[in-house]
Amino acid sequence: MAKKPTALIILDGFANRESEHGNAVKLANKPNFDRYYNKYPTTQIEASGLDVGLPEGQMGNSEVGHMNIGAGRIVYQSLTRINKSIEDGDFFENDVLNNAIAHVNSHDSALHIFGLLSDGGVHSHYKHLFALLELAKKQGVEKVYVHAFLDGRDVDQKSALKYIEETEAKFNELGIGQFASVSGRYYAMDRDKRWEREEKAYNAIRNFDAPTYATAKEGVEASYNEGLTDEFVVPFIVENQNDGVNDGDTVIFYNFRPDRAAQLSEIFANRAFEGFKVEQVKDLFYATFTKYNDNIDAAIVFEKVDLNNTIGEIAQNNNLTQLRIAETEKYPHVTYFMSGGRNEEFKGERRRLIDSPKVATYDLKPEMSAYEVKDALLEELNKGDLDLIILNFANPDMVGHSGMLEPTIKAIEAVDECLGEVVDKILDMDGYAIITADHGNSDQVLTDDDQPMTTHTTNPVPVIVTKEGVTLRETGRLGDLAPTLLDLLNVEQPEDMTGESLIKH
């Protein structure tokens, strides 16, 4: 007899917002979502700030969202941990950071700092760079070179000059530090093995072959004149006495989110790197704020805090089968992040990875691989052996990042079509679905004056539970979704999962 599956369906980057202006969620024709919304119990929950372990007012993101969802509790994020360590002064006593700087002093070499230069708070925060500069000053380091990656995605598209000016003011205040290279994140922070992009950033960082400008500001302004926004600034070298990353130097990469920092780190700190021909740096001390992946030989500044009793582990302990399914862009989120930072499958878990389309930007193909994800899931459901499904549709977020309204509307409409087939199939099997999101984005893709808005939002996300006859609590947070799943599965909630089921009892 076929099992009755319970599914968590995450519409990535899909939140509630009253105004229709620039709101693809409201403007899209989504008959299936609306049908479930009108028929079944609904509520909305918080997906940003303190509710997900981020600083107050900080927008959520997919990594944080899936970590909180899977853990069933508030998970204090790297950003919050690092901020706290700087405030407490522990940061300046950190062994790894002090060893990194001791390496510079003992080799009479240079300190290179890599990172995304913005206050977006998704991958990094430039105030962490300032703390590193203060530490270097205290320890008497003379040669400090900043390799800045420009954002324009988690912050305004053309905001780089503000961060550059503030950083240069910090250089002047401390009497150390200068920009050595500048790259748009499109090049320096790829995550899809597009090595031809990373190679451009690498060449600028190593001071090999890249355009050169007298100042960081001059290079960015020249890029603006060519019609480029921050994200797409072609890597360039800033003229100074720096001759790139050399033998005996130290690199500290201050991005705390791994997925877009891993590839560049592999080029420098993975001896087996094969993406393109590189000249290895000898005796390089390479430190990263968090662990990016197992291939990178790096000292870790902030070690991971282990999370036990995530939704996947509880399913395993109760002999339940589970499926994790998404396309490439969100596959790490339904696996690694949903499992609290664990790569290995649980017993009874299987995974389906559907390739994301190879296009320059997803507004060119708003449906992405949603139909293929849907087909793969229907195939899995037909096996009749699943207890728990965790599914992510990437489109509202990935297309929302383009800041283009029409493609984002199309993205949501494609997802809605797939949602209808999937949920109806689950209902036919006497199963349940929770339809929700991990953070906002597509709910606002234009600013009030019609400029593209490519960032996430702090708006609450909807929750639909396809079980008639129950009432949902009026508010909650992402950490309440796993307890709600356990409630539907009739599985006891362990003590360290401190969220509460959204179903009133």
Swiss-Prot record:
A GO cellular-component term linked to this record: cytosol
Pathway annotation from the record: Carbohydrate degradation; glycolysis; pyruvate from D-glyceraldehyde 3-phosphate: step 3/5
Residues at the active site: 62 (phosphoserine intermediate)
UniProt cross-references to InterPro entries, sorted A to Z: Alkaline_phosphatase_core_sf, BPG-indep_PGM_N, Metalloenzyme, PGAM_B_sf, Pgm_bpd_ind
Binding annotation for substrate: 123, 153-154, 185, 191, 257-260, 330
Job of this protein: Catalyzes the interconversion of 2-phosphoglycerate and 3-phosphoglycerate.
Record's protein name: 2,3-bisphosphoglycerate-independent phosphoglycerate mutase
Organism: Staphylococcus aureus (strain Mu50 / ATCC 700699)
